[in-house]
């Protein structure tokens, strides 16, 4: 019989399913502490005179940011109940960011105001469900009013204004985004990347560019820059690896006969096939180059199909194409006006594909983007779409340090999203004025019952909070500013917190995209009013640690000496 000595081993029973439960006002109050903590941290960034927040990171330098959603995401509270409240408001910021790309700080401020007032009304005996209904009905009325005061954005100047506001008054960024949209269109692909200089730059990548270069340096035609450059080239596409000589000889003969350069893009080119290509290039002077197809799996298959449609080439090795590569004809080869290949990337310019087929492919990819739920997938689909249409605009963000570039990239990404939103649904006066002006729509609104009217009053109070926060961050008393703004009949009259004066917000270029304000209000009211209807909060009790460390427990292993007594 095996007997283990237990000396030194002390265990604690761990009930992983143990929960802690709080009801009513106690649970809501605990969550409200978390809501307030997160909202306080986020609201300091609001407006032109908002402050920065420094966030400790588990790796690298601390992050300095004025981006609301970044601040919200960084907050994780020790107290479980407080953390639940904070996480729900985080969701509001995330949702606003996903839908409109901006307005996260505004959404957070609104959510806190609605949750706080909602909790108080319920504490005083209001019906939570009816109050929520009143909040949602009031929000519908306000959204309709926002659409009424909204103006369309059409000119490059207006686009630059929107981008400048979202980039915290950075006119360079505003003009850069406006130029990018001018070049690739308002629905074109614009990406934001780290630059390699101190200045911000705009680069337009036309045609089909992908990150795969020549397979062998022996294909180089231009010593300067170690590039392969050809004009009026033929394109051979293959989904499969090309290794045999007989696979490429017919294509080489065709290219030679037509006196045109040949670009081979395949899964890989190696063995005898690669040797033959290199020898023909060096000894005969044949204009040829081989490139590995970009991506993997379905991504590679789709990219090759895009190339085939853009250049008019047949894809060999494709399941739908039964023709063998050795039976190639001139009609199976695609055409491009220019091709430039370095060791790292390839650029195909002005493919000669059928325009009708290209448009069909663009429609197909657009449908896929609409149906996709993955951000990564959407990004890849947008890149493919851009390569088939107007190209990709790349905003290269410069700066003196990694921290500076990171902070600027956050602002540029926000500005880009806000600008797209403005083009989509128009603009309203900025600085919290649009929401304040929407109060007039609720002036004569009568709710179905007393509790719903409480919900309407909660929204009325919340609508004053964004402008109040902006003014407070500028170091002024909000009530006098709000009275001055509401006392003027001009709907675009508001307060310029940056320069400390009252102006016509549209004329001064202080504007917000309608979509940003609308989504901020809808997301905030939805989550915050639901939070107010909470009657029970359940959290996990942290697991107890085993008493005595692993080293102490090992002392009991001395009993293993009894193993000698085991008989079989």
Swiss-Prot record:
Record's keyword terms, sorted? ATP-binding, Chaperone, Mitochondrion, Nucleotide-binding, Transit peptide
SUPFAM superfamilies xref list? GroEL apical domain-like, GroEL equatorial domain-like, GroEL-intermediate domain like
Q: What is its main location?
A: mitochondrion
Keyword Kinase appears in the UniProt entry: no
InterPro entries assigned: Chaperonin_Cpn60_CS, Cpn60/GroEL, Cpn60/GroEL/TCP-1, GroEL-like_apical_dom_sf, GROEL-like_equatorial_sf, TCP-1-like_intermed_sf
Q: Where in the cell is it found?
A: Mitochondrion matrix
Q: Which GO terms describe its biological process?
A: apoptotic mitochondrial changes; embryo development ending in birth or egg hatching; mitochondrial unfolded protein response; mitochondrion organization; nematode larval development; protein folding; protein import into mitochondrial intermembrane space; protein refolding
Alphabetical list of NCBIfam families matching this protein: GroEL (TIGR02348), PRK00013.1 (NF000592), PRK12849.1 (NF009487), PRK12850.1 (NF009488), PRK12851.1 (NF009489)
Record family assignment: Belongs to the chaperonin (HSP60) family.
> Which protein, by its recorded name, is this?
Chaperonin homolog Hsp-60, mitochondrial
Gene encoding the protein = hsp-60
